[in-house]
Design a protein with these regions (language model features):
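Glycine/proline-rich loop-helix segments at beta-alpha junctions forming the active-site rim
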Residues: 2-118
Length: 118
């Protein structure tokens, strides 16, 4: 679920941040109608800041590195943008350690959903 459904426009270094009033208007109402969420992937700074608050104040890199403290229900991830290729190259542990764990957790969450809703 995105932080905003409206495109905020382009800024000097990429897309502008999602508009705060968009999430304030609809996000809690939408999540209230999804009571069986087993796993939340917090992709990028804005989602991490919204859901983790001060725990995400060190930036995306530090928040993702501390992913174990948010497990098993929330996993902070960097945005998979081409602009982040350098980050992925500087952090090989992400692909070697976090991604295999993430894949297992997603498979487990999907199995739980299929078990509940055959």
């Amino acid at each position: 679920i995105p932080m905003g459904y409206c495109y905020p426009g382009k800024g000097s270094s990429g897309d502008l941040p999602p508009r705060r009033e968009c999430a304030d208007l609809w996000l809690d109402r939408l999540l209230a109608n999804l009571p069986n969420i087993e796993l939340t992937l917090l992709i990028g700074h804005y989602a991490q800041r919204h859901f983790l608050g001060k725990a995400a104040s060190g930036g995306v890199g530090k928040t993702v590195a501390a992913h174990a403290q948010f497990a098993p229900n929330r996993i902070p991830l960097p945005h998979p943008s081409p602009r982040n290729v350098a980050w992925f190259m500087r952090n090989p542990w992400f692909e070697k350690e976090l991604l295999p764990s993430l894949r297992r957790q997603v498979r487990a969450a999907m199995r739980m959903d299929f078990d509940r809703n055959p």
